[in-house]
Amino acid sequence: MKRLLALAMTTLLLISMLSGCGSTEQPAADENGVYNVAIIQLVTHDALDAATQGFQDALIAELGEGNVTFDLQNAAGDTNTCATIVNSFVSNNVDLIMANATPALQAAAAATADIPILGTSVTEYGVAMGIENFSGTVGGNVSGTSDLAPLDKQAEMVKQWFPDAKKVGLLYCSAEPNSQYQVDTIKTMLENLGYTCTLYAFADTNDMSAVTQEAADNSDVIYVPTDNTVASGTGIIDGICQAAGVPIIAGEEGICAGCGVATLSISYYDLGVATGKMAAKILKGEADISTMPVEYAAVSTPKYNAAICEALGLTAPEGYTAIG
């Protein structure tokens, strides 16, 4: 009888252990009641910086000053560095990882299936995570916020500003899958509005100038999506396109400030705030990340770059706010 009881207890223990395998760890504050939150940001530019700041501000507001510490690391645009950074986060057993931009999210998801991961500044989670027929919830230990702009309204913006244009160049970095998603989507929308569209893809900053020049030489107007490589190289793009007299409609405000004439942009700071509020719910045990749907920005604002508009002789339509 004792042997049978021992066998039964062993079996129950094994079942309990196996049932816990692959589950997301419940975050727990350290002995001082402080949560350790790690942040990996792909690269430095205005949009990502704003999202990171919003995330930190919101999490401090939700948890209280002194109840959360941040380990903020920047990968300087290098995907290999992303992997190194997130592996160190996993080794340190942080309570939660915030991954700012798609390559950062992909690296974090590859590094751990246990620590909760929230993405932000990620355009399309189905594309980023390789999920076909994405339903809005990633599942497992991943969720976050999306910076997907209203592409249909941005296409209409091209028509509003440049109704007589014929050729639209779509300029983007081919190494960013979310940029590919955006240009493929808006291309169809623009073609339905009567434009002839051509994709101009550069691999990285090494061929950005040559591809931008080709786009400027063959386009009446250029559209650039929310693209981290573009955001880091707006000075190069602006120098070429202004000299050619070719205007740019940009996917977000930071890019527009650097090289565009107009944008319909979300607030990346507000996006970070929304991500921070999600993080607080997870850390406090109020939400299960595996069931949390990806959240989207609710508001987008039409803005214009007064300096570039003046240089190109353009006047903003009513309803646009000057950047900065």
Predicted regions mapped to residue ranges:
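Short, low-complexity disordered leader/linker segments with a strong preference
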Residues: M1-N36, A61, E65
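Hydrophobic alpha-helical segments within soluble ligand-binding/sensing domains
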Residues: D30, Y125-K167, I266-A287
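Extracytoplasmic "Venus flytrap"
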Residues: E31-E62, D71-T81, A175-S179, D227-S232
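An alpha-beta-alpha
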Residues: V37, F55, S143-L190, D288, ...
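Short beta-strand elements in bilobed, periplasmic/extracellular small-molecule ligand-binding domains
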Residues: Q56, A61-C82, N141, M189-T205
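Beta-alpha junction/loop-to-helix N-cap segments that form part of ligand/metal-binding clefts
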Residues: D71-N133, V224-G251
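Pocket-lining segment of extracytoplasmic ligand-binding domains
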Residues: P177-V246, E252
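Flexible loop/turn connectors
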Residues: I255-A307
